[in-house]
């Protein structure tokens, strides 16, 4: 924080640090599975409240679903100052990559947050995009997770040629 930091930026920073502290506390006191379930519920609720209306507000309604989802994360995170990159491979496959240092787990907190927390929020948000868009063929494939000491959080939205079972909506393919 600098002397030119606005009060709203200070408040946002404090809330973010509190959120990180809560994740650490819950994982230590209650266990990594509990923090994962908590993150799932938190992000699922936010997704249900914000995703569809925001897709419209951001002008993404008419795009292919995989592309719209990737662009959504770039635009919605960018509003809050979170750096996300996007690449459209095809109409049915679009990539997102969160730039380092990753805002979600900044500083040394990344060393104490269990991977279940990250997977909980991916399951609560990324895996639900197809459900919300009423597209049962849309899923998210995570190719890298910063909490597993890979190169950061990166993956792609993909529209398959078949309906996905709930457990297929979020996949991990680090190789």
Describe the role of every protein-language-model region.
Residues 125:
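Metal/cofactor- and membrane transport-associated sequence elements
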Residues 1-95, 102-121, 131-175:
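N-terminal accessory segment detector
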């Amino acid at each position: 924080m600098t002397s030119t930091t606005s009060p709203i930026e200070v408040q946002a920073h404090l809330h973010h640090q509190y959120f990180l502290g809560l994740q650490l506390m819950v994982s230590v006191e209650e266990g990594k599975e509990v923090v994962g379930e908590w993150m799932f519920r938190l992000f699922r609720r936010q997704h249900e409240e914000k995703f569809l209306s925001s897709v419209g507000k951001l002008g993404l309604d008419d795009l292919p679903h995989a592309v719209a989802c990737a662009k959504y994360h770039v635009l919605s995170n960018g509003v809050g100052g979170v750096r996300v990159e996007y690449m459209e491979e095809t109409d049915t496959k679009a990539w997102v990559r969160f730039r380092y240092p990753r805002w979600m787990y900044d500083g040394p907190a990344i060393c104490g947050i269990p991977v279940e927390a990250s997977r909980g929020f991916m399951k609560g948000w990324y895996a639900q995009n197809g459900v919300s868009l009423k597209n049962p063929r849309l899923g998210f494939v995570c190719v890298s997770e910063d909490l597993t000491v890979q190169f950061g959080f990166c993956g792609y939205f993909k529209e398959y040629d078949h309906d996905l079972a709930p457990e297929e909506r979020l996949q991990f393919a680090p190789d």
